[in-house]
Design a protein with these regions (language model features):
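Alpha-helical segment of the N-proximal tetratricopeptide repeat
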Residues: 2-25, 29, 33, 37-50, ...
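Canonical positions in the second alpha-helix
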Residues: 25-26, 55-58, 88-89, 122-123, ...
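Start-of-helix register in tetratricopeptide repeats
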Residues: 1, 33-36, 64-67, 97-98, ...
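Canonical tetratricopeptide repeat
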Residues: 37, 68-71, 102, 135, ...
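Short coil turns that delineate tetratricopeptide repeat
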Residues: 29-31, 60-63, 94, 127-128, ...
């Protein structure tokens, strides 16, 4: 039995000391071809230091092992050494194309996608391997060169590439067309991809595209397919619920939103949607509960505060509106509702202060001015009221009641 075989047997027995003993003997005594097989095996099971030691010994005889040395160096984070190994492979070598591809991989890992693309272009001068064309199209897609990417993918046999990579070129072409705003072409290729092989992401992209094109019935069809086949797919419930809502299936839309919240109870946009749907279904308590839940984790409170204030105003819950002031809202409508709530609760001085702060922003809004004028009358600030009425009448000159009020003041 060769030293290499003895080493492998020791590894099977998990006797690392014995394995190392035979490894050292193999380096000295075993023939090169047997050592090469041992190196391939050791690399495959993650024994990189030992594999690297063999490859370095054999590199003068088998220069192609510089590819393996480069891969191991890269795994160890030694990128400069990895490139140095690849430089040992010359253009007249059968391994040169593989070296260029590996260089492209390393450059892409380093974020130098443009340089990676140059290496694949160079490789195509030596080989017309479809996987090179595919790799170039992938890089073009990553770089945003969608037209170039489409040209590349279009050269390839979809089934052949799918069998080798698990990626559909039809799906890639459809996605690229979508980014270019060519939605009809995008849908055509995505549907073709889905016909040949079901894919969660493709179904989601189709559903989303149809929704964006306001073809809600078709969007619902693909979202439902996703919901049936792949209910664990991340994040489809929001779009599905929206599409159902557009189709006037509000109860079902709420159920789907709630289904999404079971997976992710803190997703703000789902909570806001569930609140809206609950309110439309005349479930104000549930609508409020969803908003309050969203408020706990939302980074941006403004929309939530506006919705809460609007709901409270419709229910004449003015004290609850005033309680929102502690969050220091920036939205003008929310601030306006707070000002009005001070007025409704007869805290007129606080109302006056709030209205005054809003005048610069809302002075062109007739409804705001009308409320402000009535407040000024209540406070006995008649000159200020007359001044605001004059401005109001410039905006609404045919308001007879306001003209009469001005004359009375």
């Amino acid at each position: 039995m060769s030293n290499s075989q003895e080493m492998l047997e020791a590894l099977d027995q998990q006797d690392l000391t014995k394995a190392d003993h035979y490894f050292q003997k193999a380096l000295v005594e075993d023939p090169d071809d047997l050592l090469l097989e041992l190196a391939y095996y050791l690399e495959g099971i993650g024994f990189y230091p030992q594999a690297r030691q063999i490859y370095e010994k054999l590199a003068p005889i088998f220069p192609e092992v510089n590819l393996n040395l480069a891969s191991i160096a890269s795994e160890d984070g030694q990128i400069e050494e990895a490139f140095a190994y690849l430089e040992e492979i010359q253009p007249n070598s059968d391994s040169y194309v593989s070296a260029l591809v590996l260089k492209a991989d390393f450059y892409q890992m380093e974020g130098l996608t443009d340089v990676a693309r140059e290496k694949l272009l160079e490789a195509l001068n030596y080989s017309d391997d479809p996987l090179l064309i595919f790799g170039l199209a992938e890089l073009d897609s990553e770089l945003g060169n969608d037209l170039e990417a489409i040209k590349g993918y279009a050269q390839l046999d979809n089934r052949e590439i799918y069998e080798q990579t698990g990626i559909s070129t039809y799906q890639r072409i459809g996605t690229a067309y979508a980014r270019l705003g060519k939605f009809e072409s995008a849908i055509e290729f995505l549907e073709k991809a889905l016909e040949l092989e079901y894919d969660d992401q493709t179904a989601f992209e189709l559903a989303s595209l149809y929704f964006d094109q306001e073809e809600y019935q078709k969007a619902v069809l693909y979202f439902k397919q996703l919901d049936t086949i792949s209910p664990d797919f991340e994040g489809y419930e929001y779009g599905y619920s929206q599409a159902l809502h557009k189709e006037h299936q509000t109860e079902q839309a709420l159920l789907i939103a709630q289904q999404g919240l079971e997976k992710n109870p803190f997703e703000t946009r789902l909570l806001l949607l569930a609140s809206q749907l609950s309110y439309e279904l005349h479930q104000p308590e549930q609508a409020e509960a969803y908003l309050l839940q969203a408020q706990e984790d939302a980074e941006d409170q403004e929309e939530i505060l506006l919705r809460l204030a609007t709901m409270y105003q419709e229910q004449e819950r003015y004290e609850d509106i005033l309680a929102l002031e502690v969050y220091d809202p920036e939205n003008l409508l929310t601030k306006w509702m707070i000002a009005r709530s001070y007025q409704e609760t007869e805290d007129l001085d606080a109302a006056y202060e709030s209205y005054q702060a809003l005048v610069p922003e809302l002075k062109e809004n007739p409804e705001f001015l009308e409320q402000y004028i009535h407040l000024l009358r209540e406070l006995g600030r008649f000159e200020e009221a007359k001044e605001q009425i004059q401005h109001y009448l410039k905006l609404v000159p045919d308001d007879i009641q306001m003209q009469e009020l001005y004359e009375r003041l």
